[in-house]
């Protein structure tokens, strides 16, 4: 997936060295660059449905601790555009996501922020702690903060649960190559106007972009920003009512028809939205070769 170390080390699929896969006809295959290379290509970003993976072999990276910064700001469109621009050009070691949202009633936020529209910048800097403090400080200095938390923590601490569950959600996903004042204003207006939406913006680049688009089934290597719009509701049926508004806002914040497969809804055109035509054709060929009867299917 696309995580907090991706700008520095690449996507998770870029560190996959090999896999053992049971195919539809019962064979156990060793799959890597030299053995079953087409299947290995498809496993890296293809979304599944190709076999049963019984073992994965990954390249590992030693990460002792990271600098984590969680900074909350007033929901200002000019600041949002500046934040996204700054973080998109940051060093590869600094990963980030920027949320425009209504602060949820979770334990790690003080009660005075609960229910308040905010911009949240989540920063993760792997490597030298002093450099991490400096990079977080550059973001802190962009505007007065409502709340800030900066700490040295194990990388695993960044991946813990956020403490809220039991709600319905509908998402829209895209990629953007620019995020200027107009798009920032759309994002801020959507949240401050009372709609229960979260706009999530994730700078890409770095090591993600240093892999050829056709090297794996994830072809969107050169995109600058991943965008995710989510509508939250007490139950899924209520959330589904917001789907048209989610799709409209997602399209306004994105460039082109594509979105990150992990955040796309299971709609009839999901595959066409996740993969460019050439990638989708190659995936279909791999599927036909290894599972012609479509034994493995989720849709």
Question: What is the meaning of each model-derived region?
Answer:
Residues 1-299:
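Soluble FAD-dependent oxygen oxidases
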């Amino acid at each position: 997936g696309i995580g907090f170390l991706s700008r520095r080390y690449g996507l998770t699929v870029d560190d996959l060295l090999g896999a053992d896969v049971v195919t539809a006809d019962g064979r156990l295959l060793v799959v890597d660059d030299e053995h079953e290379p087409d299947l290995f290509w498809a496993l890296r970003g293809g979304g599944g449905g190709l076999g049963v993976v019984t073992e994965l072999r990954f390249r590992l990276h030693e990460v002792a601790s990271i600098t984590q910064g969680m900074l909350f700001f007033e929901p200002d469109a000019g600041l949002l555009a500046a934040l996204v621009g700054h973080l998109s050009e940051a060093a590869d070691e600094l990963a980030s996501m920027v949320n425009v949202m209504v602060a949820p009633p979770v334990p790690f936020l003080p009660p005075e922020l609960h229910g308040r529209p905010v911009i949240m910048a989540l920063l993760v800097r792997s490597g030298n702690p002093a450099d991490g403090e400096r990079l977080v400080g550059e973001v802190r200095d962009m505007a007065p903060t409502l709340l800030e938390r900066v700490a040295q923590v194990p990388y695993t601490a960044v991946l813990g649960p956020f403490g809220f569950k039991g709600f319905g959600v509908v998402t829209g996903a895209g990629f953007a190559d620019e995020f200027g004042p107009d798009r920032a204003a759309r994002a801020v207006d959507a949240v401050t106007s009372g709609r229960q939406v979260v706009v999530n913006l994730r700078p890409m680049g770095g090591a993600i972009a240093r892999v050829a688009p056709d090297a794996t089934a994830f072809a969107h290597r050169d995109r600058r920003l991943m965008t995710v719009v989510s509508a939250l509701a007490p139950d899924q049926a209520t959330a589904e009512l917001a789907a048209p508004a989610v799709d409209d806002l997602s399209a306004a914040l994105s460039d082109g028809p594509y979105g990150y497969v992990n955040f796309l809804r299971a709609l009839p055109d999901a595959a066409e939205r996740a993969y460019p035509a050439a990638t989708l054709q190659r995936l279909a060929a791999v599927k036909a070769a290894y599972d012609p009867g479509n034994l493995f299917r989720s849709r």
